[in-house]
Amino acid sequence: MAISERASRILYGIEFVIFALIPICALAAWALFYGAGSILMFLFALMMLVSSNDSASLLEALRNLAIFAAIVALTGMGLIAIWKFLRLSAAFGNHGSKALQELRETYWRCLAWAALPLLATTALFPYADPDFSGGLLLFSGVTLCVPLFHLWLELRYRGNQG
């Protein structure tokens, strides 16, 4: 039993509001505040690396540089993934499966950009506050899998029908 494209788009809109809106806002805020701060800390760690004299401070500066570089990279990848996901959602919501088919390559790139930040946030967020780890599931990006799966189904099955 197949549902109409109009019903599928309405269902996707509901899925987007329930499962994607909170994580996108939370991840964008996290990227804005934590990512921007990490850029500053990365620059500070770079200055520490340049001015370190002994091996202990050099190792500490290298460690800090690596940590903040990883945070900046994950933040950038997450922002790119969010942008691509919003682009795909707008295309499907406004123009349906035909527009989504034209952006098939963007869908797979979105998944590639999102994989590492999604794994990192899923693995690290529960350790941030063990008392609230269940609630952090809503903010970690795991719930984005529901609308992404819907888009994949649209690409796979409605795209093959023409």
Label every model-predicted segment.
Residues 18-76, 81-83:
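Hydrophobic transmembrane helix segments
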Residues 19-20, 113-114, 143-144:
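Hydrophobic alpha-helical transmembrane segments of integral membrane proteins
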Residues 119-132:
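Juxtamembrane "helix-exit" motif on the non-cytosolic side of transmembrane helices
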Residues 5-22:
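Alpha-helical transmembrane segments and their helix-start/interface "positive-inside/aromatic belt" motifs
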Residues 52-62, 91-117:
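Short membrane-interface loop/juxtamembrane segments of multi-pass integral membrane proteins
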Residues 9-11, 65-77, 85, 110, ...:
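Small-residue packing motifs within transmembrane alpha-helices
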Residues 82-102, 106, 130-162:
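Cytosolic juxtamembrane helix at the C-terminal end of the final transmembrane segment
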Residues 1-5, 159-162:
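Low-complexity, intrinsically disordered extramembrane tails and loops of integral membrane proteins
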